[in-house]
């Protein structure tokens, strides 16, 4: 029994380990990976490995894994990556797993500066990445510093601007807030729709020379072959769509492209190494096949996948709508609960006030009762005093009578009696005056007593009214809410050729009519322009890269990816090949 070989495959978001047999082919391993991750759009992907010379190479599916120059490690290391890119992500990427893998791979390429991205666009893309990771912005959860541990912008962008982490976060957060209600998978798609308009997106660059020996770049992508000057990977100078090419071949380091136009000469260039020509051939065949497939009606399998994806998306939208509805109900119930609590507090406060008023009224009643008793006692004292004075007056009257009688009897002592009489008369007058005053005082105390009695009765009535008033109603109860392979050929083969068929193709150069995503959205376009102006104020001009300068020139000239594409394909094939030879 042959000993199994351990293999580790790293996807963009997972690490898979398998044990394979010595006779396992590249396709068998590839099939095992896509089955494990649940991927059906297999034509975009491949398995990448580092060979014994340190070069990054794609695993050939039609050969045994052990017959290929994989660096000897235990386990054998492979990366599962997108090898071919779609023309339009929103039309071609069907499954959510495919969208996520592309999103993660493109995001990594932008952050590593393998794809040049201008600063303002990098901020917009970062906000979509944040929405995809965190969902809707919530100031209660996403406190200042919530993005501190996230790698969201290329290091080049951070180093070129005199902005703090907090200032970058603020700019990303502003756009994050605008994405409210956007599903996480839709955020990934919006990211890719913006990213696919970047000039270096989906391009495989190869160093080549023309017959003159001029060093140039060959760009192979989903739309065709483009030629770049050696110091400018952003703006291609000549372009050949796949629909103009009928045959591609190489012999050692010489690569020959035969156009469909029989009048046009062969398009010839030279690569520094044979292995590069093998890679170019494999990428040309794969991209051409996908280019043709897109321009033909969908296969039954693709139609089924699209229908299933639509159904899954519809189901997610329904679930989201239901969650939003439940969330709103919960918020309404919370607000209602808060309102009831508030009203309850208000009623308790009112009840407290009534109790305080009652206690105050009771105290006033007690005070008035005390005063009434005091007044009554004063009245009694005044009455008793008046009675005493009356007795004294009578006694004086009697004494007066006795003295008068005595005066009559004793004429002898008339002077003495007259003096006594005068004295008693004066005393009587004083007593009369005192009696009168005491009677007035008694009357006054009588009035005060009546007034106090009336106040007492009135207070008793008020207290009776307060005590008999119905208690405040209890708060109502809170009701909870219801809640594809292309063999790069054997390493020993120094030549190879492939015919590229263009039969049955509809509207084969539709890509030339495209506009960028920001051109479609005026609001985003203006926001990007405003942010670009704002960032220019904080930019350190001494740290500008060659790509920054080239990008600024393109913006100034009004060029974008698709305008450039139309321009570099102008004229017939012969004219463009002649132009290439003259470079």
UniProtKB/Swiss-Prot annotation:
**Protein name as catalogued:** Radixin
How it assembles, according to the record, is:
Binds NHERF1. Interacts with NHERF1, NHERF2, LAYN, MME/NEP and ICAM2. Interacts with CPNE1 (via VWFA domain) and CPNE4 (via VWFA domain). Interacts (via FERM domain) with SPN/CD43 cytoplasmic tail. Interacts with CD44. Interacts with CLIC5; may work together in a complex which also includes EZR and MYO6 to stabilize linkages between the plasma membrane and subjacent actin cytoskeleton at the base of stereocilia.
Q: How is it modified after translation?
A: Phosphorylated by tyrosine-protein kinases. Phosphorylation by ROCK2 suppresses the head-to-tail association of the N-terminal and C-terminal halves resulting in an opened conformation which is capable of actin and membrane-binding.
Q: Which organism is it from?
A: Homo sapiens (Human)
Q: Which segments show compositional bias classed as Basic and acidic residues?
A: 376-400, 483-492, 506-525
Single GO cellular component annotation? apical part of cell
Which PROSITE patterns has this protein been placed in?
FERM_1, FERM_2, FERM_3
Biological role stated in the UniProt entry: Probably plays a crucial role in the binding of the barbed end of actin filaments to the plasma membrane.
């Amino acid at each position: 029994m042959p000993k199994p070989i351990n293999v580790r495959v790293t996807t963009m978001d997972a690490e898979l380990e398998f044990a394979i047999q010595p006779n396992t082919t590249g396709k068998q391993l590839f099939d095992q990976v896509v089955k494990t991750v649940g991927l059906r759009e297999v034509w975009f992907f491949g398995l990448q490995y580092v060979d014994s010379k340190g070069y990054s190479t794609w695993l050939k599916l039609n050969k045994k894994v052990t017959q290929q120059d994989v660096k000897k490690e235990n386990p054998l290391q492979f990366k599962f990556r997108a090898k071919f890119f779609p023309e339009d992500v929103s039309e071609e990427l069907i499954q959510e797993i495919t969208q996520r893998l592309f999103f993660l791979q493109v995001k990594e390429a932008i952050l590593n500066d393998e794809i040049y991205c201008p600063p303002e666009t990098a901020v917009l893309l970062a906000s979509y990445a944040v929405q995809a990771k965190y969902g809707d912005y919530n100031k209660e959860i996403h406190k200042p510093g919530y993005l501190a541990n996230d790698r969201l912008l290329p290091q080049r962008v951070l180093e070129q601007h005199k902005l703090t982490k907090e200032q970058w976060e603020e700019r990303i957060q502003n756009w994050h807030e605008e994405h409210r209600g956007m599903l996480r998978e839709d955020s990934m798609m919006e990211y890719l729709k913006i990213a696919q308009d970047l000039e270096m997106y989906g391009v495989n660059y190869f160093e080549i020379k023309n017959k003159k020996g001029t060093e140039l770049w060959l760009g192979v992508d989903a739309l065709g072959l483009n030629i770049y000057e050696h110091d400018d990977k952003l703006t291609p100078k000549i372009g050949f769509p796949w629909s103009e090419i009928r045959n591609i071949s190489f012999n050692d380091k010489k690569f020959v492209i035969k156009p469909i136009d029989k009048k046009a000469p062969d398009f010839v260039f030279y690569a520094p190494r044979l292995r590069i020509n093998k890679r170019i051939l494999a990428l040309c065949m794969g991209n051409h096949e996908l280019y043709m497939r897109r321009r033909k009606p969908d296969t039954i399998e693709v139609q089924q996948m699209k229908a299933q994806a639509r159904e899954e998306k519809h189901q997610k939208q329904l679930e989201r709508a239901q969650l939003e509805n439940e969330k709103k109900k919960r918020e309404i119930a919370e607000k209602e609960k808060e309102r009831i609590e508030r009203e309850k507090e208000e009623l308790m406060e009112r009840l407290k006030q009534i109790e305080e008023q009652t206690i105050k009224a009771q105290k006033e009643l007690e005070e008035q009762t005390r005063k009434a008793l005091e007044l009554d006692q004063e009245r009694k004292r005044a009455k008793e005093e008046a009675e005493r004075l009356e007795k004294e007056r009578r006694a004086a009257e009697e004494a007066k009578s006795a003295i008068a009688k005595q005066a009559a009897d004793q004429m002898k002592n008339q002077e003495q009696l007259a003096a006594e009489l005068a004295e008693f008369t004066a005393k009587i007058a004083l007593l009369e005056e005192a009696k009168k005053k005491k009677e007035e005082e008694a009357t006054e105390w009588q009035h005060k007593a009546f007034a106090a009695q009336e106040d007492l009765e009135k207070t008793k009535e008020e207290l009776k009214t307060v005590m008999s008033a119905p208690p405040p109603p209890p708060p109502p109860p809170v009701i909870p809410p219801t809640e594809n392979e292309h063999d790069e050929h054997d390493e020993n083969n120094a030549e190879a050729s492939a015919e590229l068929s263009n039969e049955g193709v509809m509207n084969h150069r539709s890509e030339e009519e495209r506009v960028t995503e920001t051109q479609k959205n005026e609001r985003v376009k203006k926001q990007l322009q405003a942010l670009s102006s704002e960032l220019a104020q904080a930019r350190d001009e001494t740290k500008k890269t060659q790509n920054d300068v080239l990008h600024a020139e393109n913006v100034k000239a009004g060029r974008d990816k698709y305008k450039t594409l139309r321009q570099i394909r102008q004229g017939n094939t012969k004219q463009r090949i002649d132009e290439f030879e003259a470079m």
